Amino acid sequence: MSAAEGRSRPRLNGSADIKTLRRYFIGGSDARIIMGDDEPALIRLWREKRGEVEPEDLSGNLVVQLGLATEDLNRRWYEASTGQVVTDVQKRVRHPALRWMGATLDGRVEGSDAVFEAKFMLPWSFSEEAAAEKYMPQLQHNMWVVAARTAVLSVITGGGKWVEILAHADPLYQHLIVTAERQNLRSAVTIRC
């Protein structure tokens, strides 16, 4: 671990401002950006981690707000449809060894300890393949953080469709994610010096 990674940082707790704390760790949503191909989003994330810009205000993004508004419904629908119970809702966790890796879990599936991720997608851009591809970095990151072997992606679409997608941990892909995240965080911390 580098000196930059080992530096003392605020702890995640319920009373802390999560927007401020997000600067000090890489989360699942960050993994999706880091492993994606949206260069402006990647540059913005890098600048956020450096403290140059505030996290983007998504309160005016209707699709994001629909996702937030349907998370509880999504979880209840998943539980009713599968008979499974989701625990650890909105639990903030850190990787036990790589303290710069964190996750805010939508939940864990009781009994299997699978990571549960609830998403809302617009019907005209939805396919199971597209959903799995879009959210795979986030699922793999979150599975790595909590040492889970599986994840469940529960998707509600604006067209009234619900889909469950099961993902298995992919150690090779997780290694690539950790490497890319580490490089992103190191560059944000060290270039400032």
PLM feature segments, named:
Residues 1-69, 73:
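Charged, glycine-rich intrinsically disordered N-terminal tails and low-complexity linkers that flank
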Residues 192-193:
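Long, amphipathic alpha-helical segments that form or neighbor coiled-coils/leucine zippers used
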Residues 64, 80-188:
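Nucleic-acid nuclease catalytic cores
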Residues 74, 78:
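A carbohydrate-recognition surface predominantly in extracellular/luminal proteins
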